[in-house]
From Swiss-Prot:
InterPro entries: Cyt_c-like_dom, Cyt_c-like_dom_sf, Cytochrom_C550, PsbV_cyt_c550, PsbV_cyt_c550-like. SUPFAM superfamilies: Cytochrome c. Keywords: Electron transport, Heme, Iron, Membrane, Metal-binding, Photosynthesis, Photosystem II, Signal, Thylakoid, Transport. This is Photosystem II extrinsic protein V. It is a peripheral membrane protein. Its cofactor is heme c. It comes from the Bacteria. It holds the Pfam family Cytochrom_C550. It comes from Synechococcus sp. (strain CC9311). GO terms for cellular component: photosystem II; plasma membrane-derived thylakoid membrane. It is found in: Cellular thylakoid membrane.
Length: 170
């Protein structure tokens, strides 16, 4: 019995020595968020294949602008009014004209058209053309549109199917 208490005492002493060291390391080491790599932040700039690399700060700003201006109907990259048409990469690429690059998304935000590109939906969808009808669009600049477009294109790389998954995922 004495050897049991002796072993227990030695184990507790070791733990009491190691515990403050471990706590000190946990407290003194700041948490670091994972850094996004350049590949994740690089998206098509236009339909000709040019690429643009956004900074993390630009994507964060684009996310904030998107959430305030578009997030009510497009939270998580879905379209609440038509869950068959989301903001996922495949759906954007299949639109006419394709909306899978920054320039074409900015063009859409300025003057939106139907998914098949046949007619304008500016009276039904918030845009710069119809900013008098949609207050969330009134104060947006061209830079805001560019940053939102960057966020829309980077989000599927970061979130995967959680971005724009549509009705099959929700």
């Amino acid at each position: 019995m004495a050897s049991f208490f002796s072993t227990l005492r030695r184990s507790l002493n070791r733990l009491l020595i190691a515990l403050p060291v471990l706590l000190g390391l946990m407290i003194s080491t700041p948490a670091q968020a994972a850094q996004w790599d350049a590949e994740t932040l690089t998206v098509p700039a236009d339909g000709d294949g040019a690429l643009v690399t956004f900074s993390e700060q630009e994507i964060k700003t684009g996310r904030k602008v998107f959430n305030v201006s578009c997030g009510t109907c497009h939270a998580g990259g879905i379209t609440k009014t038509n869950q068959n048409v989301g903001l996922d990469t495949e759906t954007l690429a299949l639109a006419t004209p394709a909306r899978d690059n920054v320039a074409s998304l900015v063009d859409y935000l300025q003057d939106p058209t139907s998914y098949d590109g046949e007619y304008s939906i500016a009276d039904l969808h918030p845009s710069m053309r119809s900013r008098d009808l949609y207050p969330a669009m009134r104060d947006l600049t061209d830079e805001d549109l560019r940053l939102m477009s960057g966020y829309i294109l980077v989000a599927p790389k970061v979130l995967g199917v959680d971005w724009g998954g549509g009705k099959i995922y929700f």
